[in-house]
Amino acid sequence: MAKVALIQRELKREKLAAKYAAKYAELKAIAGDAKRSDEEREAARLGLQKLPRNANPTRQRNRCEITGRPRGTFRQFGLGRAKIRELAFAGDIPGVTKASW
């Protein structure tokens, strides 16, 4: 089980990314637009640097909803591999069966 502080930090990052999403996308578009002047593009890059670090969506980490484990998380379920196995064997995940060939 992950520390509560790590899980809370991820939630904080999600909130910040959502808060600044529109501004981040706008500045990214300006900074990458070759038709704009160099001054405008430089101003957009500086604007991106002034945003909080955790407003960048690439800093987010997918975690297991139950345990908070950061690695081995399946996007489809939002769970870690160990919990998927445990719940699938118990029959708690509809449509998931043990492989047989």
Swiss-Prot record:
- Biological process annotations from GO: translation
Q: Which GO terms describe its molecular function?
A: rRNA binding; structural constituent of ribosome
Q: Choose one Gene Ontology CC annotation of this protein and give it.
A: small ribosomal subunit
What InterPro entries does the database record attribute to this sequence? Answer: Ribosomal_uS14, Ribosomal_uS14_bac/plastid
UniProt keyword Plastid present: no
Q: Name one Pfam family in it.
A: Ribosomal_S14
Q: Does the keyword Ribonucleoprotein apply?
A: yes
The record's listing under Gene3D superfamilies reads:
1.10.287.1480
Which spans does this entry mark as compositional bias, Basic and acidic residues? 33-44
> What UniProt keywords are attached to this protein's entry?
Ribonucleoprotein, Ribosomal protein, RNA-binding, rRNA-binding
Identify the stretch(es) annotated as Disordered: 33-63
- Segments spanning the bilayer are none
State the protein's purpose.
Binds 16S rRNA, required for the assembly of 30S particles and may also be responsible for determining the conformation of the 16S rRNA at the A site.
**HAMAP family assigned to the protein according to its UniProt record, in alphabetical order:** Ribosomal_uS14_1
Quaternary structure and interacting proteins, as annotated:
Part of the 30S ribosomal subunit. Contacts proteins S3 and S10.
Q: Which family does it belong to?
A: Belongs to the universal ribosomal protein uS14 family.
Identification of the protein by name: Small ribosomal subunit protein uS14
Q: Highest lineage ranks of the organism?
A: Bacteria, Pseudomonadati, Pseudomonadota, Betaproteobacteria, Burkholderiales
